[in-house]
Swiss-Prot record:
The gene is MT-ND3. It comes from Paralichthys olivaceus. One of its GO terms (molecular function) is NADH dehydrogenase (ubiquinone) activity. Its main location: mitochondrion. It catalyses: a ubiquinone + NADH + 5 H(+)(in) = a ubiquinol + NAD(+) + 4 H(+)(out). It is an enzyme of class 7 (translocase). The lineage of its organism: Eukaryota, Metazoa, Chordata, Craniata, Vertebrata. It is a multi-pass membrane protein. This is NADH-ubiquinone oxidoreductase chain 3. Gene3D superfamilies: NADH:ubiquinone/plastoquinone oxidoreductase, chain 3. One of its GO terms (cellular component) is NADH dehydrogenase complex. InterPro entries: NADH_UbQ/plastoQ_OxRdtase_su3, NDAH_ubi_oxred_su3_sf. Keywords: Electron transport, Membrane, Mitochondrion, NAD, Respiratory chain, Translocase, Transmembrane, Transmembrane helix, Transport, Ubiquinone.
Amino acid sequence: MSLLMTIITITALLSTILAIVSFWLPQISPDHEKLSPYECGFDPMGSARLPFSLRFFLIAILFLLFDLEIALLLPLPWGDQLPTPLLTFTWATAVLFLLTLGLIYEWIQGGLEWAE
């Protein structure tokens, strides 16, 4: 067995053991103090959980999608190994077209409407 395979095996085994132990130990003896929310030593006034807007989550996912698309399309002409610039332009246009179709679909379905 090569040195690299030995290192990868030991790393994977150690990571798996540590992950299992970290999930297993807290279930053995849950502490009431650690399970309660902390508010400067006082009893909590209400729930520590706040409601999360699903529309905000959808807008955030769309932002990340288009941000990633821009990050991938900007260096495309320099990093592309396609034979002609026209082929690069065609692929970039196809990606933009598919993303535009997805945006139009979200718009028609009402996913971009913030207030109801």
